[in-house]
Amino acid sequence: MDVLTKVPVREQDAKERATNFKEVCLGYNEEEAVAEASRCINCKNAQCVKGCPVAIDIPAFIHEVKEGNIEKAYQIISESSALPAVCGRVCPQESQCEGKCIRGIKGDPISIGKLERFVADWARENGIKPNGATEKKGKKVAVIGSGPAGLTCAGDLAKAGYDVTIFEALHEAGGVLVYGIPEFRLPKEAVVAKEIENVKSLGVKIETNVVIGKSVTIDELMEKEGFSAVFIGSGAGLPKFMGIPGENSNGVFSANEYLTRSNLMKAFNPASPTPIMRGKKVAVVGGGNVAMDAARTALRLGAEVHIVYRRSEEELPARVEEVHHAKEEGIIFDLLTNPTEIIADEKGWVTGMKCIKMELGEPDESGRRRPVEVPGSEFVMELDTVIMSLGTSPNPLISSTTEGLETNKWKCIIADEENGKTTKEGVYAGGDAVTGAATVILAMGAGKAAAKGIDEYLSK
């Protein structure tokens, strides 16, 4: 075995998967996982752990995989992570744990994410649950939002002995895991629902269809319902648009709405009561993971799909793996291109999009080179659907109905990065509601930090 080269992971064939919503990556079997784990040199001062936002003891769990002790490996992971089967699939490991791996200096880094996924899937298939609390604290904590931040915070607090209730605005728990990430990347029934069941097995209660700020306020939860502390993990669900002419035309969607229709409402299924527009030629404006998800969803619904992004491929914020999969499946990348107007017919339906070519100038405040228009390079793309994937911001409903809870100019809740503490006594926050749209694992890290902060607050 070549220890410098990682064990390849099996995937659905690109042509076949472009026509279905089944999971693309098939993961490792036990033999492959043990072989990959055997490449790990078990560093004493493991940099991979420092690269993990939830600080999983990576060398320890990989050692147990190498020895064939998969259940023990799972318990090591679940001490730190409430959602290992999710993280193993959607975390940007290449820039976090795997990006710090010593093996990667000369050769391939250890496939930490694929090993985490294998362990979590094995545990699920064998009915193994995470270890729960040994003693109860007798105090109630409310968690707002059942996405990655909320589930992580709730799981950690339940393990610490608190009586935790999650309040979810939608009819189904999971947050962005169920409405934002497609089935072909993250199966809902086989993976997400089972991870949520694991959190519930710790004693966490989940109430759906509860909109905090309408159904009940944070002050009412604390003053009338007996909750000693509240964690806000409500995410960032308000889509951003470009503000160009024609954006209100029929056939223009936010990626948020488009993906929610497909993922949560199962609109890709012809029998679904919630329709989705099956465009023939679709442009997705943006270059992040959400743009890739929307583009690959539209492709599976039968469209010719173009990614329109104003910078070059090097600046694409999406994971390398997602870009690679999109290209394999036949999605066209129109880079250094920026929309200026959406064109519609007399009935208001999209027929095209005016664009201008761009070139890269000096770096901006983000460190990426600023795109500059190329004079005289305007052209029109013929389209029937445009999906805007330009990021999201938090819904101001909670902050506007909670006295003493301060936000910044982007309506993000102001919270201490170390412990999630907000400007309101007993109220903590983390994830996209604080940072704006970011990754699943960063939201989990924030939920974990807030759980520790709440425990310290309630232990005084």
Feature names for model-found ranges:
Residues 433-459:
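A conserved FAD-binding loop/helix module that cradles the flavin
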Residues 248-279, 363-437:
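FAD-site-proximal beta/loop scaffold in flavoenzymes
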Residues 82, 147-149, 172, 288-290, ...:
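Residue-level detector of alpha-helix initiation sites
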Residues 163-166, 170-201, 206-207, 295-341:
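Rossmann-like dinucleotide-binding cores of NAD(P)H-dependent redox enzymes
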Residues 140-165, 291-299:
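N-terminal Rossmann-like FAD-binding beta1-loop-alpha1 element of flavoenzymes
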Residues 17-36, 56-89, 106-133, 262-263:
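Ferredoxin-type iron-sulfur electron-transfer modules in oxidoreductases and energy-metabolism complexes
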Residues 119-135, 192-214, 239-301, 408-418, ...:
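Glycine-rich dinucleotide-binding loop and its adjacent helix/turn
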Residues 72, 135, 140-144, 196-244, ...:
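Feature captures the FAD/FMN-dependent oxidoreductase FAD-binding
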